[in-house]
Amino acid sequence: MTDNNKYRDVEIRAPRGNKLTAKSWLTEAPLRMLMNNLDPQVAENPKELVVYGGIGRAARNWECYDKIVETLTRLEDDETLLVQSGKPVGVFKTHSNAPRVLIANSNLVPHWANWEHFNELDAKGLAMYGQMTAGSWIYIGSQGIVQGTYETFVEAGRQHYGGSLKGKWVLTAGLGGMGGAQPLAATLAGACSLNIECQQSRIDFRLETRYVDEQATDLDDALARIAKYTAEGKAISIALHGNAAEILPELVKRGVRPDMVTDQTSAHDPLNGYLPAGWTWEQYRDRAQTEPAAVVKAAKQSMAVHVQAMLDFQKQGIPTFDYGNNIRQMAKEEGVANAFDFPGFVPAYIRPLFCRGIGPFRWAALSGEAEDIYKTDAKVKELIPDDAHLHRWLDMARERISFQGLPARICWVGLGLRAKLGLAFNEMVRSGELSAPVVIGRDHLDSGSVSSPNRETEAMRDGSDAVSDWPLLNALLNTAGGATWVSLHHGGGVGMGFSQHSGMVIVCDGTDEAAERIARVLTNDPGTGVMRHADAGYDIAIDCAKEQGLDLPMITG
């Protein structure tokens, strides 16, 4: 298939309500979530099928999108659709407890797992970059990463500033689908933030959705606002239109001292996601078509300057960390030998949560009714009554987070609680308390579903950072357990050659059969995270495995 069909001037919006357009909720759910990924309120560039993260797409091209929709509409409850890099390639007879969709995106044999080969395949229409939740149809907008970013900032505040970020400020860059969560997360954590972004349209989107509070006119104005708000103890987020590779070195030169430094530009994809210093966005996109190798080189050279400035801040004793976009690797390849001197956010702040299977549990209301999410929020509080931190998160989320597309919620919980909540949501659908079924999924950034040596599995205790058996086992187990759709991807977050990861989504349709699947999947899925970390020798994970009764032959047996 030649690929000349990546642009369509159309607006997609998932159906709402409890009327089916497919044959059952098990096929209606992936249909609605695919469409929701391309809702203009959700996706970064929906007319080109781009959901987030550089070129993370929901379908390979519009012809493939149309055929996926058509196939899901006719799919029976004992059939499974296979999707290969955004292209529907087969429907096979399985059984009612099997997944309705199995997805494999961007996977390459390791020797060829690099951007150069992938871009050749992409240009020929033979591959699609699925990112993490773009090609697996469970992206919920920037909310999907807000709580993880919030938890990171809060933990950094505990470690470095005695538990309070009042009067402190975070310096970062990138206001895309992932980075757009940073300003709101910093505000919720009590800090001011200066958020650099090279595309004005991205800033406008974050202002419109209340993820960022204000835009400064220039660097001097931004610093004046930061000084004012930190002195007043206010947590206000400020956007600045500019290039981080130019602004961070200038801040170092001026002797400006942020209280925390990180970055969420799309550095994982130098051809499509990182604007070289001194270039306009239009130049960048035009030259990416005509001289891609030169564009990649220029972008990586700018990343090297950017990372050197981050290292300069770190040398001053300022907490500095990578937020999972592989910018350190890119800088190292351009000669910054000590690029990895500052840590990634997972080993620095998040791994103890992963050891207990705690990660980005999320759900979406297929009804389209915000009230359904508010009812589930209340149910979470009812079932987890003693977690004040979680209750505060839910309260802040309701107050500050604008729903994008179908109403959804993110809530970090772990082994034991995920199944408990899933079964409760299923019962709420059965009783009619919720007006339509809900889907439960997660980011691929989770405790047992990803191998990414420069991000989630950086600096593992036993040195197993690059072992990618774990996400494969996770995907296989979720398939065996009866998740509604399961995905296995390569290259999400950090780019080609640097990660493998899996995802799952399960439907709560109020039936007894769904309850059985939910109990299995929402126990097994976080259980693999506890297993993976216990196997690596983390005491927290070993203790959790024993407490939860996991059968790990080499550990609990």
From Swiss-Prot:
PANTHER family the record matches: UROCANATE HYDRATASE
Protein's name in the database: Urocanate hydratase
Any single GO BP term: L-histidine catabolic process to glutamate and formate
The protein's annotated pathway: Amino-acid degradation; L-histidine degradation into L-glutamate; N-formimidoyl-L-glutamate from L-histidine: step 2/3
SUPFAM superfamilies associated with the record: Urocanase (SSF111326)
Keywords: Cytoplasm, Histidine metabolism, Lyase, NAD
Alphabetized InterPro entries for the sequence: Urocanase, Urocanase-like, Urocanase_C, Urocanase_central_sf, Urocanase_CS, Urocanase_N, Urocanase_Rossmann-like, Urocanase_sf
GO molecular function list: urocanate hydratase activity
Organism: Pseudomonas putida (strain GB-1)
E.C. numbers: 4.2.1.49
UniProt GO cellular component terms: cytoplasm
Enzyme class: lyase
Active-site residue numbers: C411
UniProt cross-references to PROSITE patterns, sorted A to Z: UROCANASE (PS01233)
Residues bound to NAD(+): 53-54, 131, 177-179, 197, 202, 243-244, 264-268, 274-275, 323, 493
Family designation: Belongs to the urocanase family.
